[in-house]
Amino acid sequence: MASQGTKRSYEQMETGGERQNATEIRASVGRMIGGIGRFYIQMCTELKLSDYEGRLIQNSITIERMVLSAFDERRNKYLEEHPSAGKDPKKTGGPIYRRIDGKWIRELILYDKEEIRRIWRQANNGEDTTAGLTHMMIWHSNLNDATYQRTRALVRTGMDPRMCSLMQGSTLPRRSGAAGAAVKGVGTVVMELIRMIKRGINDRNFWRGENGRRTRIAYERMCNILKGKFQTAAQRAMMDQVRESRNPGNAEIEDLIFLARSALILRGSVAHKSCLPACVYGLAVASGHDFEREGYSLVGIDPFRLLQNSQVFSLIRPNENPAHKSQLVWMACHSAAFEDLRVSSFIRGKRVVPRGQLSTRGVQIASNENMETMDSSTLELRSRYWAIRTRSGGNTNQQRASAGQISVQPTFSVQRNLPFERATVMAAFTGNTEGRTSDMRTEIIRIMESARPEDVSFQGRGVFELSDEKATSPIVPSFDMSNEGSYFFGDNAEEYDN
Protein backbone atom coordinates (compact mmCIF):
# COMPACT_ATOMS: atom_id res chain seq x y z
CA MET A 1 0.00 0.00 0.00
CA ALA A 2 1.50 3.33 -1.04
CA SER A 3 1.88 5.68 1.86
CA GLN A 4 2.51 9.38 1.82
CA GLY A 5 5.36 11.46 3.17
CA THR A 6 7.37 9.99 5.98
CA LYS A 7 4.79 7.38 6.89
CA ARG A 8 6.10 3.89 6.48
CA SER A 9 3.76 1.12 5.48
CA TYR A 10 2.92 -1.40 8.21
CA GLU A 11 5.15 -3.89 6.60
CA GLN A 12 8.09 -1.53 6.90
CA MET A 13 7.28 -0.92 10.54
CA GLU A 14 6.96 -4.59 11.13
CA THR A 15 10.28 -5.42 9.50
CA GLY A 16 12.07 -2.35 10.83
CA GLY A 17 12.99 -1.39 7.28
CA GLU A 18 13.49 2.05 5.80
CA ARG A 19 11.39 3.05 2.80
CA GLN A 20 11.39 0.18 0.34
CA ASN A 21 9.50 -0.55 -2.83
CA ALA A 22 6.63 -3.02 -2.85
CA THR A 23 8.76 -5.97 -3.93
CA GLU A 24 11.35 -5.35 -1.23
CA ILE A 25 8.64 -5.01 1.40
CA ARG A 26 7.02 -8.27 0.31
CA ALA A 27 10.41 -9.98 0.46
CA SER A 28 11.33 -8.67 3.91
CA VAL A 29 7.92 -9.54 5.36
CA GLY A 30 8.32 -12.95 3.72
CA ARG A 31 11.72 -13.35 5.36
CA MET A 32 10.18 -12.56 8.75
CA ILE A 33 7.32 -15.06 8.26
CA GLY A 34 9.70 -17.75 6.99
CA GLY A 35 11.84 -17.25 10.10
CA ILE A 36 8.84 -17.82 12.37
CA GLY A 37 7.95 -20.95 10.39
CA ARG A 38 11.47 -22.39 10.56
CA PHE A 39 11.65 -21.67 14.29
CA TYR A 40 8.34 -23.45 14.84
CA ILE A 41 9.44 -26.55 12.92
CA GLN A 42 12.67 -26.71 14.93
CA MET A 43 10.76 -26.39 18.23
CA CYS A 44 8.42 -29.21 17.21
CA THR A 45 11.47 -31.38 16.53
CA GLU A 46 13.02 -30.46 19.89
CA LEU A 47 9.79 -31.27 21.71
CA LYS A 48 9.19 -34.41 19.61
CA LEU A 49 5.69 -33.28 18.68
CA SER A 50 3.76 -35.37 16.18
CA ASP A 51 2.36 -33.68 13.08
CA TYR A 52 -1.07 -33.52 14.74
CA GLU A 53 0.31 -32.11 18.00
CA GLY A 54 2.30 -29.51 16.06
CA ARG A 55 -0.92 -28.27 14.46
CA LEU A 56 -2.60 -27.79 17.84
CA ILE A 57 -3.15 -24.07 18.36
CA GLN A 58 -2.59 -24.38 22.14
CA ASN A 59 0.89 -25.83 21.51
CA SER A 60 1.59 -23.05 19.03
CA ILE A 61 0.67 -20.42 21.63
CA THR A 62 2.93 -22.01 24.27
CA ILE A 63 5.87 -22.04 21.86
CA GLU A 64 5.20 -18.43 20.83
CA ARG A 65 5.03 -17.34 24.46
CA MET A 66 8.29 -19.12 25.25
CA VAL A 67 10.24 -17.25 22.59
CA LEU A 68 8.62 -13.93 23.55
CA SER A 69 9.61 -14.56 27.14
CA ALA A 70 13.16 -15.56 26.15
CA PHE A 71 13.66 -12.21 24.44
CA ASP A 72 11.94 -10.05 27.06
CA GLU A 73 15.11 -8.22 28.14
CA ARG A 74 13.46 -6.01 30.72
CA ARG A 75 11.61 -8.77 32.48
CA ASN A 76 14.62 -11.09 32.37
CA LYS A 77 16.73 -8.41 34.02
CA TYR A 78 14.03 -7.78 36.62
CA LEU A 79 13.72 -11.51 37.40
CA GLU A 80 17.47 -11.79 37.90
CA GLU A 81 17.54 -8.82 40.28
CA HIS A 82 14.40 -9.85 42.21
CA PRO A 83 14.61 -13.63 42.51
CA SER A 84 11.20 -15.02 43.42
CA ALA A 85 10.65 -18.39 45.02
CA GLY A 86 10.46 -21.27 42.58
CA LYS A 87 11.04 -19.16 39.46
CA ASP A 88 14.22 -19.72 37.52
CA PRO A 89 14.96 -16.46 35.67
CA LYS A 90 16.99 -18.37 33.08
CA LYS A 91 14.22 -20.78 32.14
CA THR A 92 10.91 -20.47 30.34
CA GLY A 93 8.18 -22.97 29.59
CA GLY A 94 4.51 -23.76 29.52
CA PRO A 95 1.97 -26.48 28.85
CA ILE A 96 2.48 -28.78 25.87
CA TYR A 97 -0.42 -31.05 24.96
CA ARG A 98 0.23 -34.55 23.66
CA ARG A 99 -2.14 -37.17 22.32
CA ILE A 100 -1.47 -40.43 24.18
CA ASP A 101 -3.71 -43.52 23.85
CA GLY A 102 -6.60 -41.49 22.50
CA LYS A 103 -6.43 -38.93 25.34
CA TRP A 104 -4.98 -35.44 25.58
CA ILE A 105 -2.25 -35.16 28.22
CA ARG A 106 -0.83 -31.88 29.51
CA GLU A 107 2.92 -31.82 30.05
CA LEU A 108 4.65 -28.81 31.61
CA ILE A 109 7.98 -28.21 29.93
CA LEU A 110 10.92 -26.05 30.94
CA TYR A 111 13.63 -24.75 28.60
CA ASP A 112 16.72 -22.61 28.89
CA LYS A 113 15.97 -19.17 27.52
CA GLU A 114 19.46 -19.14 26.02
CA GLU A 115 18.65 -22.34 24.12
CA ILE A 116 15.41 -20.86 22.76
CA ARG A 117 17.24 -17.70 21.70
CA ARG A 118 19.79 -19.85 19.88
CA ILE A 119 17.07 -21.76 18.00
CA TRP A 120 15.34 -18.48 17.10
CA ARG A 121 18.54 -16.90 15.78
CA GLN A 122 19.38 -20.01 13.81
CA ALA A 123 15.95 -19.97 12.18
CA ASN A 124 16.46 -16.32 11.29
CA ASN A 125 19.88 -16.64 9.66
CA GLY A 126 21.77 -15.76 12.80
CA GLU A 127 19.99 -12.44 13.28
CA ASP A 128 18.21 -11.24 16.41
CA THR A 129 15.08 -10.31 14.50
CA THR A 130 12.59 -8.44 16.64
CA ALA A 131 10.13 -8.08 13.75
CA GLY A 132 9.00 -11.70 14.00
CA LEU A 133 8.61 -11.32 17.76
CA THR A 134 6.41 -8.24 17.37
CA HIS A 135 4.36 -10.13 14.80
CA MET A 136 3.63 -12.87 17.34
CA MET A 137 2.76 -10.25 19.98
CA ILE A 138 0.21 -8.75 17.60
CA TRP A 139 -1.32 -12.19 16.97
CA HIS A 140 -1.69 -12.67 20.74
CA SER A 141 -3.13 -9.17 21.04
CA ASN A 142 -5.68 -9.83 18.28
CA LEU A 143 -6.66 -13.07 20.00
CA ASN A 144 -7.21 -11.21 23.27
CA ASP A 145 -9.24 -8.53 21.47
CA ALA A 146 -11.58 -11.18 20.09
CA THR A 147 -11.77 -13.15 23.34
CA TYR A 148 -12.03 -10.74 26.25
CA GLN A 149 -13.85 -7.56 27.10
CA ARG A 150 -12.10 -4.60 28.69
CA THR A 151 -15.07 -3.01 30.44
CA ARG A 152 -13.35 -3.00 33.83
CA ALA A 153 -10.20 -1.39 32.47
CA LEU A 154 -12.29 1.26 30.70
CA VAL A 155 -14.27 2.11 33.81
CA ARG A 156 -11.12 2.25 35.94
CA THR A 157 -9.66 5.00 33.77
CA GLY A 158 -12.91 6.96 33.74
CA MET A 159 -13.92 5.94 30.24
CA ASP A 160 -17.23 4.48 29.15
CA PRO A 161 -17.69 0.76 28.38
CA ARG A 162 -19.34 1.77 25.11
CA MET A 163 -15.91 2.82 23.90
CA CYS A 164 -14.81 -0.83 23.71
CA SER A 165 -14.38 -0.60 19.94
CA LEU A 166 -11.50 1.82 20.46
CA MET A 167 -9.52 -0.69 22.51
CA GLN A 168 -7.66 -2.64 19.84
CA GLY A 169 -4.21 -3.73 21.02
CA SER A 170 -4.91 -2.93 24.67
CA THR A 171 -2.96 -6.00 25.83
CA LEU A 172 0.13 -5.40 23.68
CA PRO A 173 3.34 -5.25 25.70
CA ARG A 174 5.17 -1.93 25.87
CA ARG A 175 8.05 -3.28 23.84
CA SER A 176 6.01 -3.84 20.70
CA GLY A 177 7.61 -0.95 18.80
CA ALA A 178 6.27 1.00 15.82
CA ALA A 179 4.34 -1.96 14.43
CA GLY A 180 2.60 -2.30 17.80
CA ALA A 181 1.81 1.43 17.98
CA ALA A 182 0.21 1.28 14.52
CA VAL A 183 -2.37 -1.32 15.55
CA LYS A 184 -3.36 0.32 18.83
CA GLY A 185 -6.83 1.81 18.92
CA VAL A 186 -7.46 5.40 20.02
CA GLY A 187 -8.88 4.18 23.34
CA THR A 188 -5.80 2.09 24.07
CA VAL A 189 -3.42 5.03 23.72
CA VAL A 190 -5.79 7.31 25.65
CA MET A 191 -5.87 4.76 28.45
CA GLU A 192 -2.06 4.53 28.58
CA LEU A 193 -1.83 8.33 28.75
CA ILE A 194 -4.48 8.61 31.47
CA ARG A 195 -2.66 6.02 33.58
CA MET A 196 0.52 8.03 33.19
CA ILE A 197 -1.15 11.31 34.17
CA LYS A 198 -2.78 9.67 37.19
CA ARG A 199 0.59 8.43 38.38
CA GLY A 200 1.93 11.95 38.01
CA ILE A 201 -0.92 13.30 40.12
CA ASN A 202 -0.32 10.75 42.89
CA ASP A 203 3.46 10.66 42.82
CA ARG A 204 5.23 14.01 43.14
CA ASN A 205 8.48 12.67 41.69
CA PHE A 206 7.02 11.06 38.60
CA TRP A 207 7.94 13.97 36.29
CA ARG A 208 11.08 15.00 38.21
CA GLY A 209 14.76 14.30 37.93
CA GLU A 210 16.57 12.19 35.35
CA ASN A 211 13.84 9.52 35.37
CA GLY A 212 11.18 12.19 35.06
CA ARG A 213 12.83 13.50 31.93
CA ARG A 214 12.60 10.08 30.33
CA THR A 215 8.99 9.81 31.50
CA ARG A 216 8.25 13.17 29.90
CA ILE A 217 9.78 12.06 26.60
CA ALA A 218 7.67 8.88 26.68
CA TYR A 219 4.57 10.99 27.45
CA GLU A 220 5.17 13.31 24.51
CA ARG A 221 5.93 10.40 22.21
CA MET A 222 2.65 8.73 23.16
CA CYS A 223 0.81 12.01 22.57
CA ASN A 224 2.31 12.18 19.09
CA ILE A 225 1.30 8.59 18.35
CA LEU A 226 -2.26 9.44 19.36
CA LYS A 227 -2.20 12.70 17.40
CA GLY A 228 -1.18 10.74 14.31
CA LYS A 229 -4.27 8.55 14.66
CA PHE A 230 -6.65 11.53 14.47
CA GLN A 231 -7.68 12.78 11.06
CA THR A 232 -9.18 16.20 11.73
CA ALA A 233 -7.26 19.39 12.46
CA ALA A 234 -9.29 20.17 15.59
CA GLN A 235 -8.57 16.80 17.19
CA ARG A 236 -4.89 17.17 16.39
CA ALA A 237 -4.75 20.68 17.81
CA MET A 238 -6.30 19.39 21.00
CA MET A 239 -3.60 16.71 21.19
CA ASP A 240 -0.93 19.42 20.88
CA GLN A 241 -2.48 21.09 23.93
CA VAL A 242 -2.36 17.85 25.90
CA ARG A 243 1.24 17.23 24.86
CA GLU A 244 2.51 20.71 25.68
CA SER A 245 0.90 20.89 29.11
CA ARG A 246 3.53 21.92 31.70
CA ASN A 247 2.17 19.63 34.32
CA PRO A 248 -0.49 17.19 33.08
CA GLY A 249 -3.48 16.72 35.37
CA ASN A 250 -7.24 16.39 35.42
CA ALA A 251 -7.79 18.92 32.64
CA GLU A 252 -5.72 16.73 30.32
CA ILE A 253 -7.60 13.60 31.41
CA GLU A 254 -10.88 15.37 30.56
CA ASP A 255 -9.53 16.38 27.16
CA LEU A 256 -8.35 12.84 26.44
CA ILE A 257 -11.71 11.31 27.37
CA PHE A 258 -13.44 13.90 25.18
CA LEU A 259 -11.14 12.95 22.29
CA ALA A 260 -11.75 9.24 22.84
CA ARG A 261 -15.50 9.84 22.67
CA SER A 262 -15.12 11.91 19.54
CA ALA A 263 -13.29 8.97 17.94
CA LEU A 264 -16.57 7.03 17.96
CA ILE A 265 -17.66 9.28 15.10
CA LEU A 266 -14.44 10.85 13.83
CA ARG A 267 -12.66 7.54 13.71
CA GLY A 268 -8.90 7.34 14.11
CA SER A 269 -6.52 5.59 11.72
CA VAL A 270 -5.76 2.23 13.21
CA ALA A 271 -3.84 -0.39 11.26
CA HIS A 272 -5.10 -3.94 10.86
CA LYS A 273 -2.87 -6.88 10.03
CA SER A 274 -3.59 -10.54 9.67
CA CYS A 275 -1.11 -12.20 12.02
CA LEU A 276 -1.46 -15.98 12.12
CA PRO A 277 -0.35 -18.52 14.73
CA ALA A 278 3.24 -19.72 14.28
CA CYS A 279 2.10 -23.27 13.48
CA VAL A 280 0.43 -22.02 10.28
CA TYR A 281 3.72 -20.57 9.04
CA GLY A 282 5.50 -23.73 10.17
CA LEU A 283 3.14 -25.91 8.13
CA ALA A 284 3.70 -23.80 5.02
CA VAL A 285 7.49 -23.84 5.37
CA ALA A 286 7.44 -27.59 6.00
CA SER A 287 5.50 -28.12 2.80
CA GLY A 288 8.23 -26.32 0.88
CA HIS A 289 6.83 -22.79 0.62
CA ASP A 290 9.61 -20.19 0.30
CA PHE A 291 8.15 -17.05 1.86
CA GLU A 292 11.07 -14.79 1.06
CA ARG A 293 11.15 -15.73 -2.60
CA GLU A 294 7.37 -15.59 -3.03
CA GLY A 295 6.96 -12.47 -0.92
CA TYR A 296 4.20 -11.93 1.63
CA SER A 297 1.86 -9.17 2.74
CA LEU A 298 -0.06 -8.95 6.01
CA VAL A 299 -2.79 -6.82 4.49
CA GLY A 300 -3.53 -8.54 1.19
CA ILE A 301 -4.58 -11.96 -0.05
CA ASP A 302 -1.63 -13.92 1.39
CA PRO A 303 -2.97 -14.69 4.88
CA PHE A 304 -6.33 -15.74 3.38
CA ARG A 305 -4.49 -18.04 0.96
CA LEU A 306 -2.46 -19.53 3.77
CA LEU A 307 -5.55 -20.23 5.89
CA GLN A 308 -7.37 -21.74 2.89
CA ASN A 309 -5.03 -24.70 2.96
CA SER A 310 -3.85 -25.05 6.54
CA GLN A 311 -5.40 -27.49 8.93
CA VAL A 312 -5.16 -26.28 12.53
CA PHE A 313 -6.69 -28.06 15.52
CA SER A 314 -7.84 -26.80 18.89
CA LEU A 315 -8.65 -28.41 22.21
CA ILE A 316 -12.35 -28.16 22.96
CA ARG A 317 -13.92 -28.19 26.43
CA PRO A 318 -16.96 -30.45 26.99
CA ASN A 319 -19.70 -27.85 26.42
CA GLU A 320 -18.03 -25.68 23.82
CA ASN A 321 -19.20 -25.33 20.24
CA PRO A 322 -16.35 -26.06 17.77
CA ALA A 323 -17.89 -23.74 15.15
CA HIS A 324 -17.84 -20.91 17.67
CA LYS A 325 -14.24 -21.66 18.60
CA SER A 326 -13.43 -21.45 14.89
CA GLN A 327 -15.14 -18.07 14.59
CA LEU A 328 -13.12 -16.72 17.51
CA VAL A 329 -9.82 -17.79 15.97
CA TRP A 330 -10.85 -16.62 12.48
CA MET A 331 -11.59 -13.15 13.87
CA ALA A 332 -8.27 -13.11 15.69
CA CYS A 333 -6.38 -14.16 12.56
CA HIS A 334 -7.80 -11.23 10.60
CA SER A 335 -7.77 -8.71 13.42
CA ALA A 336 -11.53 -8.41 12.97
CA ALA A 337 -12.76 -8.15 16.56
CA PHE A 338 -13.96 -4.60 15.93
CA GLU A 339 -15.28 -5.08 12.41
CA ASP A 340 -18.95 -4.93 11.48
CA LEU A 341 -20.32 -8.47 11.75
CA ARG A 342 -22.12 -8.15 8.42
CA VAL A 343 -18.87 -7.38 6.62
CA SER A 344 -17.09 -10.24 8.41
CA SER A 345 -19.95 -12.66 7.67
CA PHE A 346 -19.90 -11.78 3.99
CA ILE A 347 -16.14 -12.30 3.68
CA ARG A 348 -16.13 -15.47 5.73
CA GLY A 349 -19.15 -16.88 3.92
CA LYS A 350 -20.61 -18.04 7.25
CA ARG A 351 -22.66 -16.06 9.70
CA VAL A 352 -20.45 -14.42 12.31
CA VAL A 353 -22.36 -14.02 15.57
CA PRO A 354 -21.91 -11.46 18.38
CA ARG A 355 -19.69 -12.50 21.23
CA GLY A 356 -22.59 -12.71 23.68
CA GLN A 357 -23.96 -15.62 21.65
CA LEU A 358 -20.76 -17.67 21.45
CA SER A 359 -20.61 -20.92 23.42
CA THR A 360 -16.87 -20.92 23.76
CA ARG A 361 -14.33 -19.65 26.24
CA GLY A 362 -10.82 -18.51 25.40
CA VAL A 363 -8.37 -20.61 23.40
CA GLN A 364 -5.85 -21.05 26.18
CA ILE A 365 -6.47 -23.71 28.81
CA ALA A 366 -5.81 -22.95 32.46
CA SER A 367 -3.46 -25.26 34.36
CA ASN A 368 -6.21 -26.36 36.74
CA GLU A 369 -8.64 -27.48 34.02
CA ASN A 370 -9.38 -31.16 33.78
CA MET A 371 -7.75 -32.77 30.73
CA GLU A 372 -9.75 -36.01 31.06
CA THR A 373 -12.76 -34.49 29.32
CA MET A 374 -10.84 -32.53 26.66
CA ASP A 375 -11.47 -33.25 23.04
CA SER A 376 -10.01 -31.67 19.93
CA SER A 377 -11.48 -30.51 16.66
CA THR A 378 -10.43 -28.88 13.41
CA LEU A 379 -10.66 -25.10 13.28
CA GLU A 380 -12.53 -23.88 10.20
CA LEU A 381 -10.45 -20.86 9.21
CA ARG A 382 -11.28 -20.65 5.51
CA SER A 383 -13.07 -17.73 3.89
CA ARG A 384 -15.35 -17.23 0.89
CA TYR A 385 -13.76 -13.95 -0.26
CA TRP A 386 -10.79 -11.84 0.70
CA ALA A 387 -10.51 -8.09 1.24
CA ILE A 388 -7.76 -5.59 1.80
CA ARG A 389 -7.14 -4.61 5.42
CA THR A 390 -7.46 -0.90 6.15
CA ARG A 391 -5.57 1.59 8.26
CA SER A 392 -7.86 4.57 7.71
CA GLY A 393 -10.81 3.98 10.01
CA GLY A 394 -13.10 4.41 7.04
CA ASN A 395 -14.01 8.07 7.16
CA THR A 396 -15.42 9.19 3.85
CA ASN A 397 -12.93 12.00 3.57
CA GLN A 398 -10.29 13.39 5.83
CA GLN A 399 -11.78 16.65 7.03
CA ARG A 400 -15.41 15.67 7.24
CA ALA A 401 -16.59 13.11 9.68
CA SER A 402 -18.48 10.33 8.14
CA ALA A 403 -21.00 9.21 10.63
CA GLY A 404 -18.79 6.53 12.09
CA GLN A 405 -20.27 3.29 13.19
CA ILE A 406 -20.46 3.19 16.89
CA SER A 407 -18.65 0.21 18.30
CA VAL A 408 -17.06 -0.62 14.97
CA GLN A 409 -13.51 0.08 13.82
CA PRO A 410 -13.37 -1.23 10.26
CA THR A 411 -10.81 -3.91 9.45
CA PHE A 412 -11.63 -4.53 5.81
CA SER A 413 -11.64 -1.89 3.13
CA VAL A 414 -15.16 -2.72 1.95
CA GLN A 415 -17.92 -0.26 1.11
CA ARG A 416 -20.66 0.01 3.70
CA ASN A 417 -22.96 2.75 4.79
CA LEU A 418 -23.06 3.49 8.42
CA PRO A 419 -26.13 2.79 10.47
CA PHE A 420 -26.02 4.77 13.63
CA GLU A 421 -28.05 6.97 15.85
CA ARG A 422 -26.19 10.22 15.99
CA ALA A 423 -28.34 11.26 18.94
CA THR A 424 -26.97 8.48 21.13
CA VAL A 425 -23.41 9.59 20.54
CA MET A 426 -24.02 13.30 20.68
CA ALA A 427 -25.62 12.79 24.08
CA ALA A 428 -22.14 12.02 25.35
CA PHE A 429 -21.02 15.54 24.44
CA THR A 430 -23.44 17.65 26.40
CA GLY A 431 -21.88 19.87 28.99
CA ASN A 432 -18.31 20.93 29.24
CA THR A 433 -17.06 23.09 26.38
CA GLU A 434 -15.22 25.65 28.50
CA GLY A 435 -11.54 25.76 29.40
CA ARG A 436 -8.56 26.26 27.13
CA THR A 437 -9.66 23.69 24.63
CA SER A 438 -13.16 25.17 24.26
CA ASP A 439 -12.78 26.35 20.67
CA MET A 440 -11.43 22.96 19.58
CA ARG A 441 -14.16 21.10 21.45
CA THR A 442 -16.79 23.28 19.81
CA GLU A 443 -15.23 22.65 16.40
CA ILE A 444 -15.08 18.86 16.96
CA ILE A 445 -18.73 18.81 18.04
CA ARG A 446 -19.65 20.89 14.96
CA ILE A 447 -17.90 18.44 12.63
CA MET A 448 -19.67 15.54 14.29
CA GLU A 449 -23.06 17.17 14.07
CA SER A 450 -22.63 17.73 10.37
CA ALA A 451 -21.75 14.07 9.82
CA ARG A 452 -24.38 12.47 7.62
CA PRO A 453 -25.46 8.90 8.38
CA GLU A 454 -26.11 8.32 4.68
CA ASP A 455 -22.44 8.82 3.86
CA VAL A 456 -20.75 5.72 2.56
CA SER A 457 -17.41 4.51 3.85
CA PHE A 458 -14.81 3.02 1.46
CA GLN A 459 -16.81 4.08 -1.59
CA GLY A 460 -16.52 1.51 -4.36
CA ARG A 461 -14.23 -0.79 -2.42
CA GLY A 462 -15.26 -4.41 -2.37
CA VAL A 463 -14.26 -7.96 -1.61
CA PHE A 464 -12.47 -10.22 -4.08
CA GLU A 465 -12.72 -13.82 -5.16
CA LEU A 466 -9.86 -15.94 -3.81
CA SER A 467 -8.79 -16.55 -7.41
CA ASP A 468 -8.44 -12.79 -7.96
CA GLU A 469 -5.06 -12.23 -6.37
CA LYS A 470 -4.38 -8.96 -8.18
CA ALA A 471 -7.64 -7.51 -6.82
CA THR A 472 -8.91 -6.60 -10.27
CA SER A 473 -12.68 -7.05 -9.94
CA PRO A 474 -14.16 -5.87 -6.65
CA ILE A 475 -17.53 -7.27 -5.61
CA VAL A 476 -19.35 -4.59 -3.64
CA PRO A 477 -21.64 -6.39 -1.19
CA SER A 478 -24.96 -4.90 -0.21
CA PHE A 479 -25.73 -5.21 3.46
CA ASP A 480 -28.98 -5.26 5.33
CA MET A 481 -28.42 -2.08 7.26
CA SER A 482 -31.30 -2.41 9.66
CA ASN A 483 -29.25 -3.77 12.51
CA GLU A 484 -26.03 -2.50 14.03
CA GLY A 485 -23.31 -5.08 13.46
CA SER A 486 -21.20 -4.92 16.57
CA TYR A 487 -19.56 -8.02 17.96
CA PHE A 488 -19.76 -6.60 21.46
CA PHE A 489 -23.48 -6.09 21.86
CA GLY A 490 -25.13 -8.19 24.55
CA ASP A 491 -21.70 -9.06 25.76
CA ASN A 492 -20.94 -11.57 28.49
CA ALA A 493 -17.31 -12.36 27.80
CA GLU A 494 -14.74 -12.83 30.51
CA GLU A 495 -12.61 -9.86 31.50
CA TYR A 496 -9.00 -9.84 30.43
CA ASP A 497 -6.86 -10.23 33.53
CA ASN A 498 -3.16 -10.63 33.17
From Swiss-Prot:
Its main location: virion. The keyword Ribonucleoprotein applies. A motif (Bipartite nuclear localization signal) lies at residues 198-216. A motif (Unconventional nuclear localization signal) lies at residues 1-18. One of its GO terms (molecular function) is structural molecule activity. Residues 1-21 are annotated as: Disordered. GO terms for cellular component: helical viral capsid; host cell; host cell nucleus; ribonucleoprotein complex; viral nucleocapsid. GO terms for biological process: symbiont entry into host cell; viral penetration into host nucleus. Late in virus-infected cells, may be cleaved from a 56-kDa protein to a 53-kDa protein by a cellular caspase. This cleavage might be a marker for the onset of apoptosis in infected cells or have a specific function in virus host interaction. It is found in: Virion; Host nucleus. Pfam families: Flu_NP. It comes from the Viruses. Keywords: Capsid protein, Helical capsid protein, Host nucleus, Host-virus interaction, Ribonucleoprotein, RNA-binding, Viral nucleoprotein, Viral penetration into host nucleus, Virion, Virus entry into host cell. Encapsidates the negative strand viral RNA, protecting it from nucleases. The encapsidated genomic RNA is termed the ribonucleoprotein (RNP) and serves as template for transcription and replication. The RNP needs to be localized in the host nucleus to start an infectious cycle, but is too large to diffuse through the nuclear pore complex. NP comprises at least 2 nuclear localization signals that are responsible for the active RNP import into the nucleus through cellular importin alpha/beta pathway. HAMAP family: INFV_NCAP. Homomultimerizes to form the nucleocapsid. May bind host exportin-1/XPO1. Binds to viral genomic RNA. Protein-RNA contacts are mediated by a combination of electrostatic interactions between positively charged residues and the phosphate backbone and planar interactions between aromatic side chains and bases. Belongs to the influenza viruses nucleoprotein family. This is Nucleoprotein. The gene is NP.
